Curated annotation (Swiss-Prot):
The keyword NADP does not apply. The gene is EMB2217. Gene3D superfamilies: Tetratricopeptide repeat domain. Pfam families: PPR_3, PPR_long. This is Pentatricopeptide repeat-containing protein At1g79490, mitochondrial. PPR repeats lie at residues 204-238, 242-276, 277-311, 312-346, 347-381, 382-416, 417-451, 452-486, 487-521, 528-555, 556-590, 591-625. It is found in: Mitochondrion. It comes from the Eukaryota. Keywords: Mitochondrion, Repeat, Transit peptide. Signal peptide: none annotated. Residues 710-786 form the Smr domain. Belongs to the PPR family. P subfamily. Residues 1-85 form a transit peptide.
Length: 836
C-alpha cells in the first residue's frame, strides 16, 4: 500500500490492486466507469508486482489510464493523477514530486519511503528516476505495455497511433516477447508490420518463427506464403536472418500436403542460400512420395546429397524403400550399404522392400543375401516376405528353393494363404512336376481351401499336355463335382487329348457337356475334326462329322474340303461325293484347283467302277471347267466352232491375276489326260493356247543364231511330250521356211523327264545327245534331221510311244495335289537311264 502525503502523480509502473483489508487507512473508492465494481469495502492499495522483481514478467490486465475518473474521492485523493514531469499545469511550476511517498505492505507496515518515481517522455529516455538515480526501464514492463496496447486495439491505424505514443523506445527483443504472448494472429501480424516501419527494426528469425507458428495453428497457409515472401525480401535486403524460419515454413506446408507451395518455397530457400535441414528434406520427400511422385522425391534427395546435410536414420528409412519400389535398385542398395557403414540399424521395412524389389527384378542372389542379413540383425521374416520370396523363385523356375522357403515358412508358424498355394501348384504344374503339384493340391484341399478354376485348369491342361488321360479326366470330374465351370482352354486341352488318343465317344460326351455349359462348340468340334484329318484317320473323321451333324454342330467349308480331299486320297469316293455336295450346297466355292485335283485322280484311275464314280464327282462340282472338258471331247458339229477357238474362249475367261497357278496346274493335268486318251491334236491346241496366254513364259527361248531352247522342267509328263513335239515343229518351220539355223538347240528337261523325252526322240533317230539335265544337238544336224519324212510325220501326227509304258510312268510320276507343287515341281523318275 502507498500512503501519499502530498502526491500528485501515480507512477506508470505502479499497479493498483484492490484488497478487502480492515487495516488499510486509505479512503474507500466509489464505483466508476472504469471499474464499476469498486465499492465501499475495497481499499485503494498500490504495490509493486512481485513478478517484475522475481520473474521479470508482467501482467497486462492491470493498468491505470492516464486520466482516471475517481468518483467519490476527496480532493486530496483526486490529486492522485498521472502526469508527466514536463507538463505545465496552469503555471510555470514544474509538476514533479513534492513529498516523499511511503510504500506499505498489506498489513500497513512501511516497506520503503523515498522520492517518487518520475515518468519519462516518450522516445526521449529509456530509464526512470528513483530519487536521484537513473534506473533502466525493465523489459517486462515494456513488453507488458506493448501487449496491453495490442490486445486493446488489435489492429489498424489506431493501434499504430497508440504504439507510436509509447513512452519508451521498443527494440526487437520487446517485439519478439510480445509476439510470443499475443495469441491472436492478426494482432501479432499488425504489431510486426508496425515494427518493420520503425527505424530500429532489424529482421529477426525468432519473430518469423513465432508468426509462422501462429499462422500454421490457424491453418492460414495463404498468410504463411505471403509472410514467407516478406521474409525472403528481408533476407535479401539485410542478410541477417538464420534459416530456422525457412525450414519451419517448408515443414508446415509439407505436412499440410501443400505440394506446389512447399516446393516453391523450397526452391526460393535454395536460391536465397538457405541451408535446408534434414527434417525439412524428409518432410518434402515424404510429401512427394505420398503424392505418387517418387522421381521428384529422388530429385530432392540428390540435391540433399550435394549439400553438407547428412542423412539421418529417418531419411534412410524413407528413401531406400522408395528407391527400391521405383526400380532404382542399385541406388537403394548403395544407400543400404552406407547405412550399415554408419552403424545405423536398418529397420524391417528397409529389409522387406529390398528383398521384395530385388526378387521381383530377378536378382535372386542379392534378395537372398539381404534376407539372410535381416535374420542376422534379429528381424523375423513376415508372411508377406515369405510370399514375395517364394513368388520370385517360383516365377524364375527355381522351384527347389521355392519349396525350401515354403517349408521354412510353415516351420515359422505361418499358414500359407490361398494365393500361395495356387502359385506353387501352377508353377510346378507348368514346369512338368505334376507329382509335386498334385501333392500340394491335396494339401490345399486338406487346409480347407477350394482351388480356383485357374488351378484346376492349369493341372488339367498340364496333364492333358503330357498325355495322361486318366489323371486329366479325374481332375475334370473333381472340378465339375465342386460346382466349378471349366474354362474354354481347359475344354480345348481335354478335347485335344481325347482326339489324339482317338477316344471319339468320350470326346463327344465332353463336347456335349461343354455345349450345356453355354460355350460355343462349333470351333472346338472343327478342331477335333481337323486333328483326325491331319492324322489321316479318315474313318474317325467321318464318324466325328456324323456326330457333329446329329448334335446340330456345324463346321466350316475349309474343313469339309480338307476331309473331301482326304477321302479322295484314300479312294473313299462314296464318302467323298456327299461331302462335295455339302460343300456346293453351302455356297462353298469349288475352284479350279479342286476340280483339277479330282481330274488328276481320274488320270491315275485304272478301275472302271471308280472311273464312273470320279466322273460323277466331276459332274457334281458344277464347275465351268467340266463343261469345257465335255465340249472338248465333242465333235465340231456339236461345238459349232473349231477346237482351237473353243480352247481360246475358255482360257480367256480365266482371271490370271488370281488363278494363274491354278490354270497352269490345270494345263498340266489336262495334257496328261488328253495324251492318255490319244487326243494329240486337242492336246497341241491346249498347249498352244497356254503358251499364248503366257502361262509358261520362259519355256521357249530364241537367242537369234546362237541357241534355241525349250524348258520343260516345270511340266507334267504329258505336257512335256506335247510341248517338245509342238516346239520342234515350230523350230522346223522356222529353219526350213526362213533358212535360220542356230548353232545349237537345247531341250532342258531336268533329271526327271530326260529319259521319257529321250526315249520318244530316239524312236525317230534324233541327233540330240543326252546329258545330265539337257538334250542338245547342233543346229545343222537338227536341220538335216528335220528334212526326213519320218520326222515330218512324227511332228505332225502322233507320238509313237507305247501307251502302257507312258501310263505306268504317269501313275508314278504325276505331281502331288498341292497347286504350286502340281504345276511347278518335277515328278520323280521311275527308273534310271541305264534301266532304259
Amino acid at each position: 500500500m502507498i500512503r501519499g502525503r502530498t502526491a500528485k502523480v501515480i507512477p506508470r509502473n505502479v499497479i493498483f490492486t484492490l484488497s478487502r483489508s480492515s487495516i488499510s487507512e486509505s479512503p474507500l473508492i466509489s464505483p466508476s466507469r472504469i471499474n464499476p465494481k469498486l465499492a465501499g469495502s475495497f481499499s485503494f492499495n498500490i504495490r509493486l508486482l512481485s513478478y517484475f522483481t522475481v520473474r521479470n514478467g508482467f501482467c497486462p490486465d492491470c493498468s491505470v489510464p492516464r486520466d482516471p475518473n475517481f468518483v467519490g474521492l476527496t480532493t486530496q485523493c483526486r490529486s492522485i493523477v498521472r502526469r508527466f514531469c514536463s507538463e505545465k499545469i496552469g503555471s510555470s511550476e514544474s509538476s514533479g514530486w513534492t513529498e516523499e511517498v511511503e510504500y506499505l505492505d498489506e498489513s500497513g507496515s512501511v516497506l520503503h519511503s523515498g522520492k517518487g518515481i518520475r515518468s519519462v517522455e516518450p522516445g526521449l529516455d529509456d530509464h526512470v528516476m528513483v530519487g536521484g538515480l537513473k534506473k533502466p526501464y525493465m523489459n517486462a514492463s515494456s513488453v507488458a505495455k506493448i501487449v496491453e496496447v495490442v490486445q486493446r486495439w488489435k489492429w489498424g491505424p489506431e493501434l499504430e497511433t497508440q504504439l507510436d505514443k509509447l513512452q519508451f523506445v521498443p527494440n526487437m527483443v520487446h517485439i519478439t516477447q510480445s509476439l510470443k504472448i499475443v495469441k491472436e494472429v492478426d494482432a501479432a501480424l499488425s504489431l510486426f508490420r508496425w515494427a518493420k516501419k520503425q527505424p530500429w527494426y532489424l529482421p529477426s528469425d525468432e519473430c518469423y518463427v513465432v508468426l509462422f507458428d501462429g499462422l500454421n495453428q490457424g491453418r492460414d497457409f495463404v498468410g504463411i506464403q505471403s509472410l514467407f515472401e516478406e521474409m525472403v525480401q528481408d533476407s535479401s535486403s539485410h542478410g541477417d536472418l538464420s534459416f530456422n524460419a525457412y525450414n519451419q515454413v517448408i515443414q508446415y506446408l509439407a505436412k499440410a500436403e501443400k505440394l506446389e507451395v512447399a516446393f516453391c518455397c523450397f526452391k526460393k530457400a535454395q536460391e536465397s542460400g538457405c541451408k535446408i535441414d534434414t527434417q525439412t528434406y524428409n518432410n518434402l520427400m515424404m510429401l512427394f512420395l505420398n503424392k505418387g511422385l517418387p522421381y521428384k522425391a529422388f530429385e530432392i534427395y540428390e540435391s540433399m546429397e550435394k549439400t553438407d546435410s547428412l542423412l539421418d536414420g529417418s531419411t534412410y528409412e524413407l528413401i531406400i524403400p522408395s528407391l527400391a519400389k521405383s526400380g532404382r535398385l542399385d541406388a537403394a542398395f548403395k544407400l543400404f550399404q552406407q547405412m550399415k557403414e554408419r552403424k545405423l540399424r536398418p529397420s524391417f521395412s528397409v529389409f522387406s522392400s529390398l528383398v521384395d524389389s530385388m526378387g521381383k527384378a530377378g536378382r535372386l542372389d542379392t534378395s537372398m543375401k539381404v534376407y539372410m542379413e535381416m535374420q542376422g540383425f534379429g528381424h523375423r521374416p513376415s508372411a508377406t516376405m515369405f510370399v514375395s520370396l517364394i513368388d520370385s523363385y517360383a516365377k524364375a523356375g527355381k522351384l527347389d528353393t521355392a519349396l525350401r522357403l515354403w517349408d521354412e515358412m510353415k516351420k515359422s508358424g505361418f499358414r500359407p494363404n490361398f494365393g500361395l498355394y495356387t502359385m506353387i501348384i501352377e508353377s510346378h504344374a507348368k514346369s512338368g512336376k505334376l507329382e509335386v503339384a498334385m501333392t500340394v493340391f491335396k494339401d490345399m484341399e486338406k487346409a480347407g481351401f477350394l482351388p480356383t478354376p485357374s488351378t484346376y485348369s492349369c493341372l488339367l491342361e498340364m496333364h492333358a499336355g503330357s498325355g495322361q488321360v486318366d489323371s486329366a479326366m479325374k481332375i475334370y470330374n473333381s472340378m465339375t463335382n465342386a460346382g466349378l465351370r471349366p474354362g474354354l482352354s481347359s475344354y480345348i486341352s481335354l478335347l485335344t487329348l481325347l482326339a489324339n488318343k482317338r477316344l471319339v465317344d468320350v470326346a463327344g460326351k465332353i463336347l456335349l457337356e461343354m455345349k450345356a455349359m453355354g460355350y460355343s462348340v462349333d470351333v472346338c468340334a472343327s478342331d477335333v475334326l481337323m486333328i483326325y484329318i491331319k492324322d489321316a484317320s479318315v474313318d474317325l473323321a467321318l464318324k466325328w462329322l456324323r456326330f457333329m451333324g446329329s448334335s446340330g454342330i456345324k463346321t466350316n467349308n475349309f474343313i469339309i474340303r480338307q476331309l473331301f480331299e482326304s477321302c479322295m486320297k484314300n479312294g473313299l469316293y462314296d464318302s467323298a461325293r456327299p461331302l462335295l455336295e455339302t460343300l456346293v450346297h453351302s455356297a462353298g466355292k469349288v475352284d479350279l484347283v479342286l476340280y483339277t485335283s479330282i481330274l488328276a485322280h481320274l488320270v491315275r484311275c485304272q478301275d472302271e467302277d471308280k472311273e464312273r464314280q470320279l466322273m460323277s464327282i466331276l459332274s457334281a462340282t458344277k464347275h465351268k471347267a467340266h463343261a469345257f472338258m465335255c465340249g472338248l471331247f465333242t465333235g465340231p458339229e456339236q461345238r459349232k466352232q473349231p477346237v482351237l477357238t473353243f480352247v481360246r474362249e475358255f482360257y480367256q475367261g480365266i482371271d490370271y491375276e488370281l488363278e494363274e497357278g491354278a490354270a497352269r496346274y490345270f494345263v498340266n493335268v489336262l495334257l496328261n489326260y488328253l495324251v492318255l486318251m490319244g487326243q494329240i491334236n486337242r492336246a497341241r491346241c491346249v498347249w498352244k493356247v497356254a503358251y499364248e496366254n503366257k502361262l509358261f513364259p520362259k519355256a521357249i527361248v530364241f537367242d537369234q543364231h546362237i541357241a534355241w531352247s525349250l524348258d520343260v522342267r516345270n511340266l507334267s509328263v504329258g505336257a512335256a511330250l506335247i510341248a517338245v513335239v509342238h516346239t520342234l515343229h515350230r523350230f522346223r518351220k522356222r529353219m526350213l521356211y526362213y533358212g535360220v539355223v542356230p548353232r545349237r538347240i537345247k531341250l532342258v528337261t531336268g533329271p526327271t523327264l530326260k529319259i521319257v523325252i529321250a526315249q520318244m526322240l530316239s524312236s525317230v533317230e534324233s541327233p540330240f545327245e543326252v546329258s545330265k539335265v539337257v538334250l542338245r544337238a547342233p543346229g545343222e544336224l537338227v536341220m538335216e534331221w528335220f528334212k526326213k519324212p519320218i520326222v515330218q510325220q512324227f511332228l505332225l501326227n502322233e507320238i509313237p510311244s507305247r501307251s502302257d509304258i507312258l501310263m505306268h510312268k504317269m501313275n508314278v510320276m504325276f505331281p502331288s495335289s498341292a497347286p504350286e507343287l502340281r504345276s511347278m515341281s518335277p515328278p520323280k523318275p521311275l527308273m534310271s537311264s541305264k534301266a532304259f
